[in-house]
Swiss-Prot record:
The protein's name in its UniProt record: Regulatory protein RecX
PANTHER family given in the database record: REGULATORY PROTEIN RECX FAMILY PROTEIN
Keyword Cytoplasm: yes
One cellular component term from this protein's GO annotations in UniProt: cytoplasm
Chief location bin: cytoplasm
Function as written in the Swiss-Prot or TrEMBL entry: Modulates RecA activity.
Localization in the cell: Cytoplasm
Record bears the keyword Magnesium: no
Keyword entries, A-Z: Cytoplasm
Residue stretches in coiled coil: none
Organism: Bacillus pumilus (strain SAFR-032)
Transmembrane segments: none
Protein family according to the UniProt entry: Belongs to the RecX family.
GO BP terms in the entry: regulation of DNA repair
Length: 263
């Protein structure tokens, strides 16, 4: 049975020591593991002892890495597991580390999911379907996801969607209502809002001001079109202006009405 012939401190890490068995380097361990297993010169170690020591060392090392990783922000169990796997911590040790992290309340997937929904709802204006997809990618169980999303009911979704609609309307104010609505619907769908919430948000954001906003946008685009075609009042140039505005999504009746007013 091999025995410890030498224990030496590592040059670059004073918290770890090298263990030599029968005059040959065998492995390194944390000082806490050294004390825990009462490792000293002359002690005999069989294969089971070595496996147990190395397992304890992997848990010690991985636990500290996990705590450091968690110090920046909350993480899901899957995120911590993936991180430790990349750090080459053995799977059995990772299981023990996760158990310890849960015991000390360093990780909790339900709390993580609730915080994630709250944060990304407010800061990134995301809808429930996108949040659900992102949480699933982070390894959160379905029941935890549903519980977390319960704090994001329809009224809050509508409130957030209306803010997004108003912001986009201001940004795209010189486009036709049709074109603006198309852009809004696409963007809010990508953000994870349902068709029902999007339609309600559009109704609430416009609140009966569609015609006024449409005419303002049409006047702006008409001046742009006239400059582009070199408008001189002729029938040919008038048709070119109408075609330009129609392609931009404006209604033909509205175009004729505004053109006639401007003559």
């Amino acid at each position: 049975m091999p025995y410890i012939t030498k224990i030496s401190a590592q040059k670059n890490n004073t918290e770890r020591v090298n263990i030599f068995l029968d005059e040959k380097y065998a492995f390194s361990v944390d000082l806490d593991v050294l004390v825990q297993h009462d490792l000293k010169k002359g002690k005999e170690l069989d294969e089971a002892d070595i496996i147990d020591i190395q397992f304890g060392d992997a848990v010690k090392k991985g636990f500290q890495q996990a705590v450091d990783y968690l110090s920046y922000r909350m993480r899901s169990v899957k995120e911590v597991t993936d991180y430790l796997t990349k750090k080459e911590i053995p799977a059995p040790a990772i299981s023990e580390i996760i158990h310890k992290l849960k015991h000390y309340k360093y990780v909790n997937d339900l709390e993580f999911a609730e915080a994630y929904v709250s944060t990304h709802r407010k800061t990134n204006s995301k809808g429930p379907s996108v949040l659900k997809k992102e949480l699933k990618l982070k390894g959160i169980e379905d029941d935890h996801i549903e519980q977390a999303l319960s704090q994001y009911p329809d009224d809050l979704q509508l409130e957030e969607a209306v803010k997004q609609v108003q912001k986009l309307v201001r940004k795209e104010k010189n486009r036709s209502t049709k074109e603006i609505e198309q852009r809004i619907k696409l963007q809010l769908q990508r953000k994870g809002f349902s068709f029902e919430i999007i339609d309600k948000a559009l109704q609430e954001a416009y609140d009966g001001q569609e015609e006024e906003k449409e005419e303002e946008a049409l006047l702006y685009m008409m001046e742009k079109a006239k400059r582009k075609v070199g408008y001189d009042g002729s029938f040919e140039k008038k048709m070119k202006v109408k075609q330009f505005l129609f392609r931009k999504g404006f209604d033909l009746d509205t175009i004729d009405h505004v053109l006639d007013k401007g003559e």
